[in-house]
């Protein structure tokens, strides 16, 4: 069974992340917030595709569901300045 920490590690091994937080407690369903400079200039679909590419075959084999919020560093900064 996969842990949230393992999933974070898999993503950060293949994607530059300024911030990442993965939650999940059943080993197959996860929620993630991922902030990466690699998302700059990309649509949300392209950002998600980049995360899927970072996970490779794990998306088909180990992970049943991944709900994610992807943000550029600038968007993350704006979000945090509002709070």
What spans do the regions from the language model cover?
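A short interface-forming secondary-structure element
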Residues: 33-46
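Conserved loop-to-beta-strand segment in the C-terminal subdomain of adenylate-forming
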Residues: 28-32
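Solvent-exposed beta-strand sheet faces enriched in polar/charged residues
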Residues: 23, 33-35, 69-71
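N-terminal first-folded block
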Residues: 1-27
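C-terminal structural segments of small proteins and small subunits
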Residues: 53-83
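Short, non-transmembrane amphipathic alpha-helical segments
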Residues: 7, 11, 47-61
């Amino acid at each position: 069974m996969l842990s949230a920490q393992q999933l974070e590690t898999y993503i950060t091994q293949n994607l530059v992340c300024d911030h990442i937080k993965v939650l999940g407690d059943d080993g197959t369903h996860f929620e993630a917030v991922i902030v990466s400079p690699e998302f700059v200039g990309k649509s949300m679909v392209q950002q998600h595709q980049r995360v899927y590419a970072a996970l490779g075959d794990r998306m088909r084999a180990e992970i049943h569901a991944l709900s994610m919020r992807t943000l550029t560093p600038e968007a993350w900064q704006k979000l945090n300045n509002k709070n």
